[in-house]
Amino acid sequence: MASKCLKASFSSGSLKVPGGAGGGSARVSTIFSSSSCKLSGLSRGPRSFSACSVGLGKSSCRAASCLPALCLPSGGFATSYGMAGGWFGEGILTGNEKETMQFLNDRLASYLEKVRQLERENAELESRIRDWCEQQVPYLCPDYQSYFQTIEELQKKILCTKSENARLVVQIDNAKLAADDFRTKYETEVTMRQLVESDMNGLRRILDDLTLCKADLEAQVESLKEELLCLKKNHEEEVNSLRCQLGDRLNVEVDAAPPVDLNRVLNEMRCQYETLVENNRREAEDWFNTQTEELNQQVVSSSEQLQSYQAEIIELRRTVNALEIELQAQHSMRDALESTLAETEARYSSQLAQMQGLIGNVESQLAEIRCDLERQNQEYQVLLDVRARLECEISTYRGLLDSEDCKLPCNPCAPDHSPSKSCLPCLPAASCGPGTAHTTCSPRPICVSCPGSRF
């Protein structure tokens, strides 16, 4: 319908009109398209035109049942036109050119009339279509905005539910992790409690061992006290016996009045032994006092340690829930206690070794004292023998002095012989004994001391 006006150019004024086989009346039918118009089925009188083609430049026109209004101009042809046609049947032009042109003009007029009619019908159809479209209620799309709002709300709820589910899943995972942590903490606490209980049992056993050691040491102290008392008693008895013996001997020797000052010697010996005994006694008392003080201090320290252990046990019972935090502190405390126990055992062993060494020293001193006492007893026996021999000699000399009435000169070898002086007889050293016979000796030229005498 939007095609341009056609310009018919007929070459050299010739027209070829195809005719039908029957040669009936002419009928024009137009067919329009975007760029062509074709005439078909033209027939007039005894001849029929089956097709008529009009060359319009580059476009062609075929007559059909309809032809658009703009395909041809409203007026006639202003320019020359050419038509070509073929006769069917006889194919021979009859009449002259004027009739042919008239025929063609009539045909063209009818054709144009038909075109105008079709244009009017087309316009009428267009107006009817336009009226129908105006009368027809326009189709409205349904309003889905409320549904969209509902869908958006539901989507928001779904997103919130998904986020809530994710949060719940995260919380569940966190709760599971926390439960696992608490389970591991509980297991560690249980194991730590078992370890602490085992440590407490070990400390109780150590405390029992220390109590037994304390009882043993107290028993040893008591036995050492008793032994010390026995030693003191024996020492006092021996000292008293020695004093009695030395006192008796002193009384006897005072009467003898020897040239050697035995009293001074005995006094010196007595002073030495008394000082030695006093020093030994003082040392023994000091040692005993120091050992007693040390044992008391050890008892006090053991009681303090026992109290500290009890306090630690109470503190451990209170701090069972915080064992994981104080684990290292408890380990260090245990190490400190073990080191203290080792130091205590080492100290006790060293003190025991010292006590054994002191006991060995005291025993060696006692052995030396016994040896000294035996030596003194031997010397005392020797002195008693000497005393007996001296008393025997004195009694012998007295008997001889009393029995003899002969008067011997004191110096018979001198030129002046005086009968008033006499010489004492000489006795051999071997004859001075309690069981020997008393014999006299011949007078000597010079009165000198006997070779075996002590005076």
UniProtKB/Swiss-Prot annotation:
Q: Which UniProt keywords apply?
A: Coiled coil, Intermediate filament, Keratin
What cellular component terms from Gene Ontology apply here? intermediate filament
Which residue ranges are recorded for the region named Linker 1?
Answer: 133-143
* Segments for region (Coil 1A): 98-132
Region (Coil 2) location: 261-404
Q: Where is this region: Linker 12?
A: 245-260
Cited InterPro entries: IF_conserved, IF_rod_dom, Keratin_I
What does the record give under GO molecular function?
structural molecule activity
An example GO BP is: epithelial cell differentiation
| Region of interest (Coil 1B), ranges | 144-244
Superkingdom, natural source: Eukaryota
Record Pfam families? Filament
Q: List the disulfide bonds.
A: none
Tell me the segments the record calls region Tail. 405-455
**Residue intervals of the IF rod domain:** 97-408
Which Gene3D superfamilies does this one have? Answer: 1.20.5.170, Single helix bin (1.20.5.500), Vasodilator-stimulated phosphoprotein (1.20.5.1160)
Site (described: Stutter): A346
- Which portions of the sequence form the region Head? 1-97
What other comment is given for this protein? There are two types of hair/microfibrillar keratin, I (acidic) and II (neutral to basic).
**Would you identify the family this protein belongs to, as annotated?**
Belongs to the intermediate filament family.
The protein depicted here goes by the name: Keratin, type I cuticular Ha5
Record the organism: Ovis aries
